[in-house]
C-alpha cells in the first residue's frame, strides 16, 4: 500500500485480495510472471489478474521475490539478515557461505539465485522433516511445515516435466512418488523429503539438457525410492 500511494500506481482490480499464502502457493491470480527488470515491485503491483487469487496455479518467481520486499519493509532487514539469527545459525548454516542475490540498488534479497552447499540444503530439509524442530527447539512453526508438505493446489495443467504436474505446497513441489516433496532449484538442485520414510536426499547437479532434472528424479525413483517404498 505504501508503494502504491507514494508512486500513484494504477493497480488492477482484485490485487488487494492477494495474500502471503497465495504467494507461497503460486496462486496469486496472475497468468504470467511480472518483469523482474527495473522496479520489480511496481511491475508486480501493476500486473493484471486473470484468475481469482487462490484458485489457479501459475509459477510466479516475482511473487516469491515480493516476500523479500515485505520483510525489508516491515523489519528493515533483508531476508538473509532476518533469517540468520532465526534460522541459519540455529540449524548450523554458516551465513558467510550462503549467498542470496539482491535486486540491484534495492537491498532486497530474493532475486532468483541463491548459492548454498549440499550439506546446508540438507540441514534445512531435515528441519522440515522434523516438523520445524532442530535439537529440541521449534525453529520453524510446526503448522507451517505441516501445510508446506501438503498439496495446497493442483498443478495438473502446468506445462512442466511430469514431476511438475503433481501438486504444490508452500514453495515445495509434490513428486510423482506419493508422499514425497521437494525443494527444486534451477538445473536440478534438489532436496527430496519423504516424511513417511524419515528420508531426506540433497543433491547438486548441472542438468542443463532437455528434461534433465526429470531424468535425475527418474533415476532416484528407479534406483532408490522404489525399493524403499517396499520396506
Residue ranges and their predicted role:
Residues 45-46, 101-116, 166-176:
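Carbohydrate-binding/catalytic loop surfaces
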Residues 2-33, 52, 62-65, 116-119:
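Conserved catalytic neighborhood of penicillin-recognizing serine enzymes
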Residues 183-231:
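Structured C-terminal helix/loop/strand segments within mature extracytoplasmic catalytic/sensor domains
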Residues 84, 88-148:
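Active-site-proximal binding-pocket segments
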Residues 9-14, 51-59, 107-115, 183-187:
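Solvent-exposed loop and edge beta-strand segments that line ligand/cofactor-binding
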Amino acid at each position: 500500500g505504501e508503494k502504491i500511494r507514494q508512486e500513484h500506481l494504477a493497480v488492477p482490480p482484485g490485487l488487494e485480495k492477494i495474500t502471503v499464502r497465495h504467494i507461497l502457493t503460486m496462486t496469486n491470480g496472475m497468468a504470467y510472471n511480472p518483469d523482474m527488470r527495473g522496479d520489480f515491485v511496481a511491475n508486480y503491483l501493476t500486473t493484471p489478474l486473470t484468475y481469482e487469487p487462490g484458485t489457479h496455479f501459475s509459477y510466479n518467481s516475482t511473487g516469491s521475490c515480493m516476500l523479500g520486499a515485505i520483510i525489508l519493509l516491515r523489519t528493515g532487514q533483508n531476508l538473509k539478515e532476518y533469517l540468520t539469527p532465526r534460522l541459519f545459525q540455529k540449524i548450523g548454516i554458516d551465513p558467510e557461505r550462503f549467498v542470496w542475490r539482491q535486486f540491484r540498488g534495492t537491498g532486497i534479497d530474493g532475486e532468483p539465485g541463491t548459492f548454498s552447499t549440499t550439506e546446508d540444503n540438507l540441514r534445512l530439509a531435515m528441519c522440515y522433516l522434523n516438523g520445524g524442530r532442530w535439537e529440541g527447539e521449534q525453529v520453524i512453526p510446526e503448522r507451517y511445515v505441516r501445510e508446506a508438505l501438503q498439496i495446497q493446489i493442483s498443478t495438473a495443467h502446468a506445462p512442466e516435466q511430469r514431476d511438475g504436474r503433481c501438486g504444490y505446497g508452500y514453495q515445495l513441489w509434490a513428486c510423482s512418488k506419493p508422499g514425497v516433496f521437494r525443494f527444486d532449484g534451477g538445473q536440478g538442485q534438489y532436496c527430496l523429503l519423504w516424511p513417511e520414510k524419515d528420508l531426506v536426499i540433497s543433491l547438486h547437479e548441472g542438468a542443463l539438457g532437455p528434461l534433465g532434472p526429470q531424468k535425475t528424479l527418474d533415476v532416484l525413483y528407479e534406483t532408490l525410492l522404489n525399493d524403499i517404498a517396499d520396506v
